Regions:
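Transmembrane-helix bundle of Major Facilitator Superfamily
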Residues: 1-170, 304-305, 313, 319-327, ...
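Transmembrane core module of solute transporters
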Residues: 1-43, 149, 187, 212-229, ...
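Small-residue-mediated transmembrane helix hinge/kink sites in multi-pass secondary transporters
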Residues: 20, 52-53, 141-142, 200, ...
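C-terminal module of multi-pass small-molecule transporters
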Residues: 58-68, 84-85, 101-105, 112-125, ...
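A gly/Pro-rich, aromatic-decorated transmembrane alpha-helix motif that marks the paired
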Residues: 128, 132-148, 197, 201, ...
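C-terminal membrane-cytosol helix-exit motif in multi-pass small-molecule transporters
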Residues: 158-177, 193-205, 222-237, 438-448
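Short, Lys/Arg-enriched, Gly/Pro-containing loop segments at transmembrane-helix junctions
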Residues: 177-182, 239-245, 369, 410-413, ...
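Intrinsic disorder in cytosolic terminal tails and internal cytosolic loops
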Residues: 178-181, 445-492
Length: 492
């Protein structure tokens, strides 16, 4: 499961540094380059709920292997692509494969580890590997594009995919929902896709086409109508794709909301901090990617120790404290100016990474305990989808705030660099406020229902645990924002 997570996370941001090389090789237009990135994100986000429900109905291992096969073969096609059309199509199919396999990864972990300590350790490893993929993506992409043919950024997935498929076939048992809830809700599947596809499209393309463009307004309208239809269908269906009663759980709703706040903040800031490093401090793309390595390593380290902290302090305190560390890290960034050196950046990176790593495993465990195991796949898919959409919203909203402040500074006579820095700092302050609200949300919704102490979570019922989304990766698509670094013409 960790190998699969590494591969899909890596594919979200490994293309960033290689984009100029791909453009020269395939003679792509700017619009074509955008779709090399966007096609993957569009199909991934649009089909996550479908993948999660199919995993519950037809078997988590089966869907995982199907997704892995699709992802691996499409990686081969992308690596060998000789034209922009073939590459964009292959990237879209990669997103389909990722949408099938990702919801199944944590559902399989839940089914495979019945002991809470072992399960928490497995989730910590999963999160740490994802964080390492974040760090490795820009570095691997830069090295490959500099020394080898760009296609190898996709071809490296092929042996990993084959090995993962073989390991899964040999060592992973099949699991699925009980027969009573294994009927496929086809209208719900269609409505969910019709809601997520246009919403994702509008969030990706709105900045380029203009938020009032007919196609963007139409996409938002279609998403709203489809989402309303989805809720009506799910409320009236005997065997719904998504049991709306899941959201009556304080832990599930609060945990999902906390993850959305986390994703909104971390993915938006990841994107604009990349711009700050390159456009204000003069970092090269590869150097900017390397600058995030200490943060990703802190995510991995603190994800590994988070279970011990949670066992002593409880999930609500651990998650809230992790978000406090993230707030402090961003506050340090808000103090940086035009002449900041890397030693000035490092404390903020490390605190932010430590907080992100510390909060995600306990957050995942808390949400897992609020959901029936039979709904593991769809619970994972819901959190994946909410994380994807929240991350894109983070880029969109923080970007709008940045550009508004930047424009005001330019009108006041500031030079472009100072104007961008002013907008960046404003975006940081808004994100700090949002994460501070997340501290309260997580503490209040994840606290135990009884007054009993929570030093040992093994007393909790193990048979009703479920799963969650991509944990500790500021990826993210994991790393949807990192992918977007190359495609926002409105930022200087």
């Amino acid at each position: 499961m960790s190998l699969a997570a590494f591969m899909t996370y890596l594919d979200n941001n490994v293309t960033n540094v290689a984009i100029p090389t791909i453009q020269r090789s395939l003679h792509l237009s700017v619009a074509g380059l955008e779709w090399v990135v966007s096609s993957y994100l569009l199909t991934l986000a649009g089909l996550l709920l479908v993948g999660g429900r199919l995993a519950d109905v037809y078997g988590r291992r089966r869907l995982f292997q199907a997704g892995m096969a699709v992802f691996t073969l499409s990686s081969l096609a992308a690596g060998l692509a000789g034209s922009g059309g073939v590459l964009i199509t292959a990237r879209a199919v990669q997103g389909v494969g990722a949408a099938l396999l990702m919801p199944a990864t944590l559902a399989i972990i839940v089914a495979s580890f019945t002991n809470i300590r072992e399960r928490t350790m497995a989730i910590g490893i999963w999160a740490a590997v994802g964080a390492l993929a974040l760090a490795a993506g820009p570095v691997i992409g830069g090295l490959i594009s500099q020394h080898f043919r760009w296609g190898w950024i996709f071809l490296i997935n092929v042996p990993v995919g084959v090995i993962t498929f073989a390991i899964t076939a040999r060592y992973v048992d099949e699991s699925r929902a009980p027969d009573a809830i294994r009927r496929l809700d086809l209208p719900g599947l269609i409505a969910s896709a019709l809601a997520l596809f246009p919403l994702t499209y509008a969030l990706i393309e709105g900045e380029v086409d203009g938020w009032t463009a007919p196609q963007i307004l139409g996409a938002f309208a279609l998403a709203a109508v489809a989402a309303a239809a989805f809720l009506v269908i799910e409320a009236r269906t005997a065997n719904p794709m998504v049991d709306l009663a899941m959201f009556r759980s304080r832990e599930f709703s609060g945990g999902t909301g906390t993850m959305m706040i986390w994703s909104f903040g971390i993915l938006g800031i990841y994107f604009f901090t990349s711009l700050y490093l390159q456009q204000t401090l003069g970092f090269s793309p590869t150097k900017a990617g390397l600058a995030f390595v200490p943060m990703a390593l802190c995510v991995a380290l603190f994800a590994a120790i988070a279970p011990r902290v949670e066992a002593r302090a409880g999930a609500h305190r651990t998650v809230a404290f992790g978000m406090v560390l993230m707030v402090v890290g961003l506050a340090l960034f808000a103090r940086l100016g035009l002449q900041a050196g890397y030693t000035s950046l490092l404390p903020g990176f490390m605190l932010f990474g430590a907080g992100a790593g510390l909060m995600n495993v306990p957050l995942t465990n808390a949400v897992m305990q609020s959901t029936q195991a039979a709904r593991a796949g769809i619970a994972s898919a819901l959190l994946n989808a909410s994380r994807e959409v929240a991350g894109l919203l983070g880029i969109t909203v923080i970007g709008a705030i940045l550009r508004t402040r930047q424009s005001a500074a330019l009108r006041a006579g500031a030079d472009p660099v100072h104007a961008f820095l002013d907008g960046y700092h404003t975006g940081l302050l808004v994100t700090i406020a949002l994460l501070a609200a997340g501290v309260a949300v997580s503490y209040l919704t994840l606290r135990p229902r009884s007054a009993a102490p929570v030093p040992n979570r093994e007393s909790l019922a193990l048979g009703e645990l479920a799963t969650v989304d991509e944990l500790a990766v500021p990826s993210p698509a994991g790393l949807a924002p990192a992918a977007a670094v190359t495609r926002n013409p409105a930022v200087p």
